[in-house]
Amino acid sequence: MTFERGYQIFVRTAYIAGIAIIIVFLPFSKYILSIGMWTITGAWILERVNLKKFTGFYTHGSLFRKILLALPYTLMLWFVSIGKGFRVFFRNKPAMILASLYVLHILGLIFTSDFGYALKDLRTKAPILILPLYFSTSKAFGRNDFYRFMMIFVLNLVIVTLANTWKLFNFEFIDIRDISRHVSHIILGLMISMALFVAGYFLVRKKRTSVWIKLVALVIIVWFLIYLVISRSFTGLGVFIVTLFVLLVIYTFRSRSIWLKAGCVLSMALLLVGGGLYLRSIVRDYYRVETVDYSKLEKVSPLGNPYTHNIQNKQTENGHYLWIYVQWDELREGWSKRSRIPFDSTDLKGQPVQFTLIRYLSSKGYRKDAGGLEKLTDEDIEAIERGIADVVNLNRLSLKGRIYELLMGYEKYLSTGDPTGSSLMQRLEFWRASRGIIAEHWLVGVGTGDMNQVFTEQYRKMKTKLASDQWWRSHNQYFSILIGFGIFGLAWFLISLIYPAYVKRGFEDYFFLTFFIIVMFSLLTEDTLESQAGVSFFYFFYSFFLFGRREHDPL
């Protein structure tokens, strides 16, 4: 093997290794993710170095000359190779337009006053520029290599989800979202949603796939769906269902087979009707309240102590009134025998434990006295200590508890105007703040670095009841772009995402289209591009699917 051939193999191997590192560590570590980015960067530069000039310099001339000029000559070759790469890049119009969003962020410095945050934001957004650059100017992968990368992506997520599930069942988590410590649970949900469609491709679409691979793909699909439920990933489940529905619509119109059309229509009907009936039944259960004859309420407990009945307070938990049949002295005494947390203290979520106890007992239909407390198991006591206030939330394989939480947050907001503690109502408050900012800065936006500042000012102006430690940004990427760069910036953002895919016929490719639907819908409820993991996930797979492979996989 010649030196030149060995060099080429080394550079290509480093490039492949960098891609593999990014795929593996996207859900794990932003630091090692950065190593993957730097590995690709190094390989991209070395690939374009003039090897003859490089070796010629070190094989000719005096030793003194080599030592004196080694560093500047090497740097010169690197800069020349970078220039070669950019010249190729500038001839690739779709890749340039995709990466142009980074230029928009640079231009946003004109209107910013917080340059410290702006520069930090530019570092975070670097993948917007470098990933389209690298993939569009490097040798594309063949179909088999592409499939191997996709298998690595899916199997890696299997490991991540199994590890998270093990942690969930073996450690105490106040917030279930904390099981995903290294990447946002929302970004992880998007990755899993995409992996579901990758596994689905090997199950249904890919030809010459062995029965064993199809069986493994089916098991993985079932497992990912279970994980999305037990991890309460509404975003992951939501974008999966929406993407599946859109694909079914596309297949209905594109297919020439009457049986496939019928199957798609039936599947869509099942999704809509089944999902609607399931949601309707949960909402009806939530608002179904026990019938109580207030004139016949018992006055004392079995131990002879007087009950407190607050019949004016209509609060319920799982259909049972909270403030009837309450005997505080018996609860205080009984709780002190069952728990180390003082009755007047707070649970692990920071809520008054006595009220968590009241809600939990009510959710089981028990009276709030010594008798009701005695019926609780040790597992019930542990749940109350963790801040779980409804027995419905103990069932990890059901979405009922999560939907109850959303409905409770909605009712609390209607009665108090305070969205704190409800993810749904907080998002509505974020969007309300966003609309206020957009109304004032719709033309050119506030710039790259002033987002946090203008949101803080807007929340004060609104006199919001949202807790100040949760005065967050819009949780809607379209709003974020509009606030940062104005209406023309939003238009360019959409062009930068749609035009390259249109020109490269990405919308005719199964992998790109499913990914595109997933991320575009996710942008409605999340600032996906505001974190390193999110922007890396978005632009890595966009660039990889569109520029990084030779053959597309048709729908």
Residue spans for each PLM region:
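N-terminal hydrophobic segments of proteins, predominantly signal-anchor/transmembrane helices
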Residues: G18-P27, T39-T124, F153-N164, V519
